[in-house]
Amino acid sequence: IGQIYGIRKDYPNAILWYKKAIRKNYIDYMAHWFLADIYTSTNRVNDAVDEIVIAKILNRNNPRIQNAMEAIFTKAKIHYEDWCFNPQYELGKNADSSINVTADEKWLGFALVKAVWEYEPGYRESMGVAKNNYAIIEDRESIISLYMGLTNSKTKFNKDPQFKVLKKALDEKFMDPYIIYEIILPKTPSAAYQLSEEVINLMKEYVLKIRCDK
């Protein structure tokens, strides 16, 4: 219904119906996306920013949402650098059961923690996580180890956007949003549908406060 009103340029009713759809189902990414379009058409740029970011969180890899977000951010004078979290390491188990860790120097701390979670007998279970299951604590430990390694080696964080944003996220206490937005959602976009409205809005704050430059 909101789309019909939007096509007719009856923007007040379009907004009303999109908001109804969102109240009924907060994880409806299309409602947030189309509401952002309506807000853009009515020069409510700040509201458009909020809605398109939520749509981006709910459908992390959609290229059309990415394009819409970039267009809205341009109007709002917000800079969003589009990069991917890309850890440089490989793990393997040798014939003699020894573990092989190959990693870029900067990623060694991250890789070693991943190796412990993957291969250390009983470690995963000792952390309350069943075998073959995922829990965010694994990436928390990996990220903290990565950060400590970068800090100890006096790495210049600003030279790599992954590290620059990581430092900012940890400084501002946004570690979990960093993990969800940068690591989990790009690999498993459907995980967004299990996020609460509160967490989604915290993610939005992360994107606008940590990920973006104004």
Region locations from a protein language model:
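Helix-start (N-cap) detector for alpha-helical repeat units in TPR-like alpha-solenoids
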Residues: Y29-M30, P63
